[in-house]
Regions:
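A short alpha/beta connector and helix-capping loop motif
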Residues: 19-38, 48-53, 58
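Glycine-rich anion-binding loop/nest that anchors nucleotide
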Residues: 129-135, 158-161
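Gly/His-enriched, cation/cofactor- and phosphate-binding structural elements
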Residues: 130, 140-141
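Short acidic, Gly/Ser-rich segments with clustered Asp/Glu that frequently serve as metal-coordination loops
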Residues: 1, 8-20
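Long, charged alpha-helical interface segments
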Residues: 65-94, 98-104, 118, 124, ...
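Extended, compositionally biased flexible segments
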Residues: 41-45, 49-75
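Structural motif
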Residues: 6-9, 29-31, 51-54, 83-86, ...
Length: 203
């Protein structure tokens, strides 16, 4: 698809898009995604220190010297209210910046699926591209399940036609929708996060 004519929805359930959604719900001024740690630092240097919070991770671990990591729990509260959030993550922020030419771009997770659908319903003349950020370039269960939820609803509510990949994601979601939390805990990335102490981000 030509991304410049499409509405792109980037999904990184564990954890970038969940973190971004949480930060916005907590009243941050804006979220600025960065492709790399170096770019995040360069972006931060363009603002007064009191105006931003610098967040990021590599391999799930907070970046040394940054204010916050990539746990949604860290962005739920007054620390981010009124601040610019500059964030660089292993998977999600790269996917967001890659599709910057899109007609419009949204970030999605299970937390904001209803809001994303409400926004998408205004674009009935557009193609929708669901981007699963994955894990280090690999397939991941959690993003595919969320994509399946959105693909199902887009087909039902906007009449969008599914690609084969979207259809597979939809079928997977239909099969597993009653056990999403269990699937998140069992999937590769979820299990990895639990193993390094971030079980609260998975549940």
């Amino acid at each position: 698809k030509d991304a410049s004519r499409s509405v792109v929805v980037v999904i990184d359930v564990l954890r970038a898009t969940s973190t971004i959604v949480t930060a916005l719900a907590s009243g941050c001024e804006e979220v600025i995604p960065a492709e790399s740690i170096e770019e995040a630092i360069a972006l931060a240097n363009g603002y007064k220190r009191s105006d931003y919070v610098l967040g990021g991770e590599r391999r799930g671990v907070p970046v040394e010297g940054f204010d916050l990591g990539n746990s949604p729990q860290e962005y739920d509260g007054p620390r981010v209210a009124g601040k610019k959030i500059i964030i660089a993550t292993t998977n999600g922020t790269n996917a967001i910046t890659e599709y910057g030419v899109a007609r419009d771009i949204f970030v999605a997770c299970f937390l904001n699926a209803d809001a994303v659908m409400e926004a998408c319903r205004a674009y009935k003349d557009s193609d929708f591209v669901l981007v699963c950020s994955g894990q280090d370039g690999r397939f991941c269960m959690e993003d595919t399940l969320c994509a399946g939820l959105l693909a199902t609803r887009l087909a039902e509510e906007t009449g969008a036609e599914m690609s084969d990949a979207a259809r597979v994601a939809s079928l997977l979601y239909q099969q597993r929708k009653e056990s999403i939390e269990d699937e998140l805990l069992r999937c590769d990335h979820g299990a990895y996060l639990v193993g390094i102490g971030y079980e609260q981000d998975v549940r």
